[in-house]
Amino acid sequence: MSEMEQQPIFKIALGIEYDGSKYYGWQRQNEVRSVQEKLEKALSQVANEPITVFCAGRTDAGVHGTGQVVHFETRAQRKDAAWTLGVNANLPGDIAVRWVKHVPADFHARFSATARRYRYVIYNHRLRPAVLSHGVTHFHQPLDAERMQRAAQCLLGENDFTSFRAVQCQSRTPWRNVMHINVTRYGAYVVVDIKANAFVHHMVRNIVGSLMEVGAGNQPESWMAELLAAKDRTLAAATAKAEGLYLVSVDYPAHYDLPVLPMGPLFLAD
């Protein structure tokens, strides 16, 4: 057995924040920029060996994360500061490690997760934004957030989300359990906050697209329940844009004792 093989293997979890506007999504792909590729490159430089990461949720092109969780295995023995400050020094400015935690061998960023939470930020104003143009979705028609909130409550619990599932979704089942969904106005911003055990492809953006139709008065509040019951994607509204969507937190069993930080994004309180 070589000296390298005799060294212990460490399993490490990281909290990751990123602005997804310049990336073709989380997942590593040939010849395009991905968050995973940039993170693995930075980790490999610090570890001085090739590193592969596994994430809690693979976000699409243009989608952001303030609470993404990843894990990786390494034989490199480093101080926590190396996995935070050291890795951040090797990352582009729009990706950052927020925390580090050594985890037991049975931990998996995706399969150990019990819930994911997303926030979708709509800038509801007649005129488009400039500074936050890649971090919010602009919708110029006035939205009634209270109407959207009432309409959304039919989505709670375990349901078949075929009407809000992308045609190309590869999940074996359209059934998901929504634990909460809240629509709140903060001045010119309307935020849709949704937590579920997992999500089918484009589920949040498809729900938001339809909720905006309700909020704008183009559809009745009862429309969301009708869409859910219909199990037909063609009846729902267009998919909302990627730039307003953030993966803000991932839940794990308490015994893993992972850090819990403010979710954000931007000005949003927890």
Curated annotation (Swiss-Prot):
Q: Which residues bind substrate?
A: 118
The protein's annotated catalytic reaction(s) are: uridine(38/39/40) in tRNA = pseudouridine(38/39/40) in tRNA
Q: Which residues form a coiled coil?
A: none
Q: What keywords would UniProt list here?
A: Isomerase, tRNA processing
Query: So which domain of life are we looking at?
Result: Bacteria
- Stored InterPro entries: PsdUridine_synth_cat_dom_sf, PsdUridine_synth_TruA, PsdUridine_synth_TruA_a/b_dom, PsdUridine_synth_TruA_C, TruA/RsuA/RluB/E/F_N
Indicate the residues that form the catalytic site: 60
Q: Name one GO molecular function term.
A: tRNA pseudouridine(38-40) synthase activity
Name the segments for region: RNA binding: 107-111
- What residues correspond to the site Interaction with tRNA? 58, 78, 110, 126, 139
Which NCBIfam families does the UniProt entry name for this protein?
A: hisT_truA (TIGR00071)
Family from the record: Belongs to the tRNA pseudouridine synthase TruA family.
The record's function comment reads: Formation of pseudouridine at positions 38, 39 and 40 in the anticodon stem and loop of transfer RNAs.
Q: What is this protein called?
A: tRNA pseudouridine synthase A
Source organism of the structure: Klebsiella pneumoniae (strain 342)
